């Protein structure tokens, strides 16, 4: 079973590390090509392209400039500990045991605009390059064209290595669009998280993102290997709703706190 999640815009390169083990990203040659393209952009161009403030554009121009192909624990940190958005608040990887990291390294993948696919312990230098950004490159007009089948092929390798054919899609639509489902040697299961608001259940972005992290943690902590085991997920008040679910979609609901 292979879990897919999105990266985060918020990064943490200060907190103490909970493991010293690390691996290197497998697609760095591709990352280097994107860095070459990104370095051509001025801070105002970055601001427009990414729809971010001038201050953030300056920070990211500096990140592109400072990026180097030799990754060490001094200039990079493990991806699962560097990302700090809502998904990662739910995941809480900073509390993982070494055995948890082992299981995650085999069964969890983070999709990335710059790195393509990251394993949890892959070192990562700081960046911001969302998958949906239209960064022109030698392979096309955006990052989807740049990555082509590369991400899908890398996921197929991971599936073959663990000897099964199930992908748990906990990534956002923007990131999962970089995967080619018809070329993926897997059954795709998509958990959906609905929160009650004024008597109606709907996807509330902040809660849904955190729930994706909670579900990832649930799978890792319990060493789950079969999709039917996901229905036992009950973190922070969520419960499985069989009637709303279908073959490829598992629906979890949570009542509004009154």
Swiss-Prot record:
It comes from the Bacteria. GO terms for cellular component: cytosol. InterPro entries: YaaA (IPR005583). One of its GO terms (biological process) is response to hydroperoxide. Pfam families: H2O2_YaaD (PF03883). Belongs to the UPF0246 family. This is UPF0246 protein YaaA.
């Amino acid at each position: 079973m292979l879990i897919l999640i999105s990266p985060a815009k918020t990064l943490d390169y200060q907190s103490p590390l909970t493991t010293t083990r690390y691996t290197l990203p497998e697609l760095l040659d591709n990352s280097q090509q994107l860095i070459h393209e990104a370095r051509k952009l001025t801070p105002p161009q970055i601001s427009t392209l990414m729809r971010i403030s001038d201050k953030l554009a300056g920070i990211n121009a500096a990140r592109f400039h400072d990026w180097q192909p030799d990754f060490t624990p001094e200039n990079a940190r493990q991806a699962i500990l560097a990302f700090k958005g809502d998904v990662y608040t739910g995941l809480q990887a900073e509390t993982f045991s070494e055995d948890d990291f082992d299981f995650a390294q085999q069964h969890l993948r983070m999709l990335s605009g710059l790195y393509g696919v990251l394993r949890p312990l892959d070192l990562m230098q700081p960046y911001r390059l969302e998958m949906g950004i239209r960064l022109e490159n030698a392979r096309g007009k955006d990052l989807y064209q740049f990555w082509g089948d590369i991400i899908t092929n890398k996921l197929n390798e991971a599936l073959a290595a663990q000897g099964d054919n199930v992908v748990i899609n906990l990534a956002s639509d923007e990131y999962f669009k970089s995967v080619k489902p018809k070329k993926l040697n897997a059954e795709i299961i998509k958990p959906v998280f609905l929160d009650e608001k004024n008597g109606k259940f709907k996807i509330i972005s902040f809660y849904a993102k955190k729930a994706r992290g909670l579900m990832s943690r649930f799978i890792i902590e319990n060493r789950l290997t079969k999709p039917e085991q996901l229905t036992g997920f009950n973190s922070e008040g969520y419960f499985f709703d069989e009637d709303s679910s279908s073959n490829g979609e598992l629906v979890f609901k949570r009542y509004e706190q009154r």
